[in-house]
């Protein structure tokens, strides 16, 4: 964490500590002694996107399976950009094994209602035949449903459907309640609990934006993509 919560007031006899030294001091305080439990039990959640494809690898043109519930109102099985782009959403859970098991159960349930279709396992789509081969998600005739569809039509005009069909995994995390008093004590904060927590989360986001590129560089590369994907993006 950095930002205002990471600052150490200088004194006439002691210079301001560097960010690295303060980071090491804070990390040591969180991982040793009575504070070691403070990082355990945070809430975790996963949102996983996967394209429905036919046995030949082409993106499915069929509607979102009715047996999976309404994509507009189902909180755990919905669609993202495309009607074929299923999104599986876990609730926030404390244990990693619970998270993986819930996601596994969702996959098994979905596969029971896909017929001969498959969930494409990689982020980059395959066997793409231009923008027209990617159906935009539909959410019914209600005002909210129509708004969600029109929003996606706008994305198609701005970025193209092929780019929007790239799927991914979102990982959500929140620190456990016991973490915040410990961190506030280490930071010698005089702010209210609410203000301190908000400040700390924004500081974390700033650090993520500063260092997040290395995660994409190391783990976000796709070493191989289908030739149809690149040609569709240049002509779609």
Region annotations inferred by a language model:
Residues 5-156, 163-167, 196-220:
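Terminal catalytic/cofactor-binding subdomain
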Residues 170:
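Histidine-centered active-site/metal-ligand motif
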Residues 173-236:
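Extended, regular secondary-structure scaffolds
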């Amino acid at each position: 964490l950095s930002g205002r919560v990471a600052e150490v007031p200088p004194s006439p006899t002691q210079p301001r500590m560097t960010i690295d030294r303060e980071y090491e001091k804070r990390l040591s305080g969180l991982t040793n002694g009575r504070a070691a439990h403070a990082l355990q039990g945070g809430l975790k959640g996963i949102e996983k996107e996967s394209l429905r494809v036919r046995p030949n690898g082409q993106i499915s043109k069929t509607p979102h399976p009715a047996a999976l519930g309404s994509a507009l109102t189902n909180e755990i099985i919905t669609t993202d950009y495309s009607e074929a782009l299923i999104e599986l959403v876990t609730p926030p859970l404390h244990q990693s094994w619970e998270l993986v098991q819930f996601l596994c159960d969702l996959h098994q349930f979905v596969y029971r209602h896909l017929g001969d279709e498959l969930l494409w396992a990689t982020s980059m789509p395959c066997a793409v035949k231009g923008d027209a081969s990617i159906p935009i998600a539909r959410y019914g005739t209600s005002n909210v449903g129509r708004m969600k569809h029109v929003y996606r039509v706008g994305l198609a005009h701005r970025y193209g459907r092929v780019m929007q069909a790239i799927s991914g995994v979102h990982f959500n995390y929140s620190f456990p309640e016991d973490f915040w008093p410990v961190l506030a004590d280490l930071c010698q904060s005089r702010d209210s609990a609410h203000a301190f927590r908000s400040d700390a989360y924004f500081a974390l986001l700033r650090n993520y934006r500063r260092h997040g590129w290395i995660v994409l560089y190391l783990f976000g590369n796709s070493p191989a993509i289908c030739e149809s994907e690149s040609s569709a993006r240049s002509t779609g």
